[in-house]
């Protein structure tokens, strides 16, 4: 009982309990939210009967064979590159305990299987960046590593990094990270938020893996013109310490900025999943340039298209219909358009994670995390290529590994 009172009043022995409380709080939030979708061993049963038992290439594109796909998965720490026929072209072994030193802030015994390569970035010379995320245990995220094409480690930056990364034309690396804090926020309009809690950051890292800058997302919002209107919503967010859950950082290029008068070259688009919100921040001034909500919910992978439209993976905006959507939003007119939401014989619903890629000729490459599925649609929304990753439970071939990062390339890009 005294332990419980010490937590509420922040008195002795609260400081002694702090470490375990932080871990328990972070783990509780993620596990309870996801437990109905994710199995403990990293395998999942596809959400639709149409996809159960499907393995490998299921729809072949004979009209365009210049297709290479890179993907990471939830099981074996191997990054694979396949061709248009689904044949393995190359692989990188990025096993964390074999390749990396355990970060000193990880004080728990965590299994290797829980440290997963969440996002990858492939350089033309075969080097690869990997973000290591501790699934269901964000406080134990491992960091970012760079490997060469032979899977030799080039550098490793420990840190609680997570979700997606982006790389600017100049080679700077943009990523998300968090701290687990045990004191109240000192920023304006956050007096109602009590610890333990996550504080979320944008990190800018140079090509040698050295941290150049760290920007607090909450601090930036609290000092913006959006602060009072937005931050009170955190009180109602059922996030138990994970108040924002940022899951995308996207660098706005000069070509993209030229098509949107609101944003500038070098701005960063950040998706905040817990509050169904998207922000645009100037990393030089740390000012919030734009903040908005829309007809989406639980969104991931939010980017700016070459036409200057915000485009996102809307995981839960059509949850009642059991659909996810690829959605385009114009921040100037506030008009939105659904680019894809599945077909009757090819249902599309990914409640967590997942990503997409805008391709020439209005094609879209889509990664559906839970189903272990990657596919490409044409301008008429027809599926022209489909592949289910072949990593399956040895005891049940209907259980598949999840696919995290799925990215499409042409031969000239490799």
Residue ranges of each PLM-predicted region?
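Histidine-/acidic-rich catalytic cores in large beta-rich domains
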Residues: 1-414
